[in-house]
Design a protein with these regions (language model features):
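Short beta-strand elements of ligand-binding domains
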Residues: 1-2, 188
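Cap/lid and interdomain-hinge subdomains that line or gate substrate/regulatory clefts
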Residues: 2-150
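Anaerobic metallocofactor- and corrinoid-dependent redox/one-carbon enzyme cores
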Residues: 92-93, 122, 133, 138-141, ...
Length: 481
């Protein structure tokens, strides 16, 4: 990190980096821009940023190694991301894959393989704290007589999913020693649709609670759980979580709303950040409650790490959220869906890993901001899709070029139906992490000064950095091959 004029100057760093490249080890080099005196022990801001980016991404790599992705179910509705690829998880992330059939939930519910005391505590807390909202189903699709049974069922599902991921020593005390161990899962996915949800209450409450900074036990560390068992979005959520320690928003990248379309549908002309249009990020009934943006820091709406989350944040988050009887058009077995609208203009980063046959994994990154819409405008747009689902309006930062020429171009270039949204502009750290794992980035809007990759990447070209990234990742190959 020291930029000095004395012997050997930058020579030792340059020599070391050249040697590493020559033997195929892509090392990172940190060299400050301004010359420092030899007795100056301060760390310049540019060096500090590089050190933190490297350490944060490196810790994420280390935390993933040896952990599991737990597939709870199989492929949801033919979604490609639900096809859990063990080569990707093993070769690129150093993770293993574990699998259960969704009938394991049925077995544990029917045979009482959960802590009955915790169930009573959880059920009471959920009924006292989760506000049940309007049933938006047509009258012939409404089943109010089943609601209480649905609440009991989804509470048990939530406890069981957590036990499957992390284990629960209480189960051993109850005589279920094998089940007490769990699967050592740092991330999981729940299939749900359609085989489960056509018959049983859906997994929306399960996914929502586990992804959130709190539950009936109080404020605690969230888990990472992907809707529809989309393992690639789950891995993307995991990246964001490990880099920030904040809960991740799982969303459908559902609709691009042009300013003209918004005005035509609502009579309101978009302004401010929304003037160029927006992306409607709306998941099918679940996402972290922290996505409501009701936590506050220095007067600003934020998403906090669990260890900064306060009781006031929890109360505001619950107040902003309603749980509606699930659309029985989608979910014949019933259940409940989470609804909120993300508050404030929060800086966020949306990312997604996609797999391409013959190429391998690639990553997309879009930094931008959430926006709020007037209530009547938001209501009208929500009615056009699903009013009972969690809603985040997202405006990516535009560069005027390529995939970020317009908001429409971002939507058009997005590689799949889902995205993982993290609080903060963390695109630079995602790029650093991706380079460590040899995952090329096929689109991003991160300013050049925040991009930090191994020094050897410059040996693959300096004019087109995107192309050089692909060549370098292909040459060095996955970390765990």
């Amino acid at each position: 990190g020291l930029s000095g004029a004395g012997r050997p100057g930058a020579g030792s760093l340059a020599a070391a980096l050249a040697g590493h490249a020559q033997i195929g080890i892509p090392a990172f080099g940190i060299y400050g821009e301004h010359v420092q005196d030899a007795d100056d022990t301060s760390i310049p801001e540019d060096v500090r940023t590089r050190l933190l980016d490297y350490a944060t991404a490196g810790l994420a790599v280390a935390q993933m190694k040896g952990e599991a992705y737990l597939s709870m179910g199989s492929v949801s509705m033919g979604i490609a991301g639900s096809v859990v690829d063990p080569d990707f998880f093993g070769s690129y992330l150093g993770m293993r894959n574990e699998y259960i059939d969704m009938s394991e939930f049925t077995r544990r519910i029917e045979e009482g393989i959960y802590d009955p005391e915790e169930y009573e505590q959880a059920y009471q807390w959920i009924r006292e704290n989760f506000k049940q909202g309007k049933d938006w189903n047509p009258p012939e699709w409404q089943y109010p007589e089943k609601h209480e049974d649905w609440w009991k069922f989804v509470t048990k599902m939530t406890i069981i999913a957590r036990d499957l991921m992390h284990g629960n020593p209480r189960l051993a005390e109850l005589g279920f020693e094998e089940e007490a161990g769990g699967h050592g899962a740092i991330v999981a996915g729940f299939q749900g649709q359609r085989q489960w949800t056509d018959h049983f209450p859906n997994g929306d409450v399960l996914e929502t609670i586990l992804n959130t900074n709190f539950d009936w036990t109080g404020i605690r560390q969230p888990s990472v759980v992907a809707t529809e068992n989309d393992s690639l979005n789950g891995a993307s959520m995991l990246f964001g979580y490990l880099l920030t320690n904040t809960p991740q928003i799982f969303s459908d990248v559902r609709t691009y709303w042009s300013p003209e379309s918004i005005e035509k549908a609502t009579g309101w002309k978009p302004e401010g950040r929304a003037a160029a249009g927006l992306l409607d990020l709306r998941n099918s009934g679940s996402t972290t409650l922290d996505g409501a943006g009701k936590a506050v820091r220095d007067g600003e709406n934020v998403i906090k790490p669990w260890y900064e989350f306060t009781e006031e944040d929890r109360e505001a988050t619950l107040e902003a959220t309603t749980f509606h009887p699930a659309s029985t058009g989608y979910f014949r077995g019933g259940g409940f869906s989470t609804h909120f609208r993300t508050s404030g203009e929060m800086p966020v980063t949306m990312c997604r890993i996609n797999l391409v046959r013959g190429l391998g994994p690639v990553m997309q990154i879009a930094e931008g901001y959430t926006v709020e819409l007037p209530d009547e405008v938001a209501f009208t747009i929500e009615e056009r899709t699903n009013i009972e689902w969690p809603t985040t309006w997202f405006v990516p930062n535009l560069t005027g070029e390529g995939a970020f020429k317009s908001v429409y171009d971002v939507m058009n270039a997005w590689g799949a139906n889902h995205g993982a949204i993290s609080y903060g502009h963390i695109g630079g750290q995602l790029i650093t992490l991706a380079s460590m794992l040899r995952i090329p980035v096929n689109m991003h809007n991160v300013p050049a000064e925040r991009v930090f990759r191994p020094k050897a990447w410059s040996l693959f070209g300096t004019e087109s950095l995107e192309a050089a990234d692909f060549r370098a990742c292909e040459t060095f190959g996955p970390m765990y091959r």
